[in-house]
Structures are given as structure tokens and as C-alpha cells.
Amino acid sequence: FNKKISNNNLSKINKDIEIDFSNIIAPLSENLKNFKLIGKIEKGKFTKISAKGGFGENNFLDITMKQDKKNKKKYLEIYSDLTRPLLTEYNFFKGVTGGKLFYSSIIDGDNYNSKLKIENFNLINAPAMVKLLSLADLSGLADLAEGEGLSFDVLEIKMEKKENILILSEILALGPSISLLMDGYTSPEVTSLRGTLVPAKTLNKMIS
């Protein structure tokens, strides 16, 4: 009952807002400084956002969101010079270090279509990747993944959320040692992925 009252009160909020934080403690002790957000709320929900903050050493976070007045869809874009503070809550990205992150999403009610791109990153001590490489009889790369890590030039993920299921229509990772192409889905109960893993030496033989 109280929750219904709270939701009803929020749905009545219509105003422009401006937020200014001098310091926000982000995950993994990455402090976000001088974070400023200008936005617009209609019926209790954001319809416009423009935000920016800095992690220090010329590393920034930018967030923009706009709503199309005709179809009511929202268009969200996020850019970050640091990936880990934004991905640390997701087990799927465990082991990702370094790199720059680009994220775009078309939000339609509770559903969305999104693209995630990470450039120039390392994958270090990632249990899922180590297991995958071991099963593929690539023990040398598995050892590297547990130690110094595997470097990748780019990771691109196309995803679509419908109800409680996140459909991963394409996962593409390209690196000097190995490349991956996968698809699948994840839900609160299970994660299922399938695809192709190609070591660089195999790819070189195919090209030459």
C-alpha cells in the first residue's frame, strides 16, 4: 500500500533538475569527481539527461539521454574512459581491465535494444574464459589468461531485453592472440552462450 502511494507521488513529479556532486565513491575505489547532471523529469521519469564527471588523469564519464516526443522511445548514450567502475556489478565482465567504453541503448518502456563496445582492454584471471580455453585444448592461452591476461583490440555486444530475458544477438571480440564470435541469452535462472573461438595462429593460416 505504501509502495503504491510512493509510486503515485513520483508519477506526479514534473520538473527540470540540476545535480552537482564534488566527489562520488564509485566501485573499485574509483572516485568520480565534479559530477554534474542536468535533466528533465516528466511523470516521475527522466526524459532528458546530460551529465559529466571525471575520474582524474584525463579520464571522463559522459552520459546523455533524450526522448523522442512522437514514439516516446528514449535514446541513451554512455562514454567512459574507465570500464571497471561501470562493469564491476556484472559477473559476465569479471576480469575486464583497462579500455574505453561506449554504450548506446534505445529504451522502449521496459524493453531495450543496446550496443556495448569496449576498446583496447585486457582480460585477466577471468574464470569463464579460462575454462573455455581449457575445454578448447588451448592450455597455453588458458595459462596466459590466468597470469598476464589476454589483450583484445575490441569487444562488441549487441543485446536486446524482453521481459526478464536478455538476448545476446552478437558478441564479437578481436585480439592478437584469440578472437571470439558468440551469441546466447541470459536470465535470472540461466546463462547460455554458443559460438566460435579462433586462435590467432589458426586465423593466420586461414588468411595466408
Task: Show where each model-derived region lies.
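Membrane-proximal interfacial segments on either side of biological membranes
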Residues: 1-171, 175-208
